[in-house]
């Protein structure tokens, strides 16, 4: 009961925060990255697996979808394979995962430590920013075509927290 109330409350807060941010910044589409078996195949340690798999992600995604659509914001769930491995700044090609395929892909950058991704040019970028940008790029190929300077992605110091 306590757990359900906590996640219902947190889901509502997250959904409201995203909806409010989109309205204030004139954003018309929200793209959420999703993998079908991400909980079943997670291998991040025994305790971390228990904590991660405990979160009702689909319920939270549903709340975000409902809030967005209630104010006319388009909600899209996008398959997100390889978005954390591909380099956004180097414009790596992002393949789609195929079950049973043994194809090896080479990406120009790599994750160097928790939360940091290093590009081919040696630029350090937040790993979540890299992955999220690639999810958007995977859904909308030309999402960033008019932007020439991406330095704001790795020079930003503003932190957003949900309370």
Where are these regions (language model features)?
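Positively charged, helix-rich recognition surfaces that bind polyanionic ligands
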Residues: 1-163
């Amino acid at each position: 009961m306590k757990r359900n109330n906590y996640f219902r409350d947190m889901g509502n807060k997250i959904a409201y925060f995203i909806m409010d941010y989109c309205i204030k910044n004139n954003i018309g589409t929200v793209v959420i990255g999703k993998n079908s078996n991400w909980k079943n195949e997670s291998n991040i340690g025994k305790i971390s697996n228990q904590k991660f798999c405990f979160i009702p992600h689909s319920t939270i995604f549903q709340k975000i979808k409902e809030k967005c659509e209630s104010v006319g914001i388009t909600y899209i769930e996008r398959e997100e394979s390889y978005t954390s491995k591909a380099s956004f700044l180097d414009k790596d090609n992002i393949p789609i995962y195929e079950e049973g395929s043994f194809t090896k892909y080479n990406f120009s950058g790599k994750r160097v430590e928790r939360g940091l991704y290093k590009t081919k040019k040696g630029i350090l970028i937040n790993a979540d920013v890299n992955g999220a940008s690639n999810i958007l790029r995977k859904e909308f190929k030309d999402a960033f075509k008019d932007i020439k300077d991406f330095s704001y992605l790795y020079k930003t110091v503003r932190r957003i927290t949900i309370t």
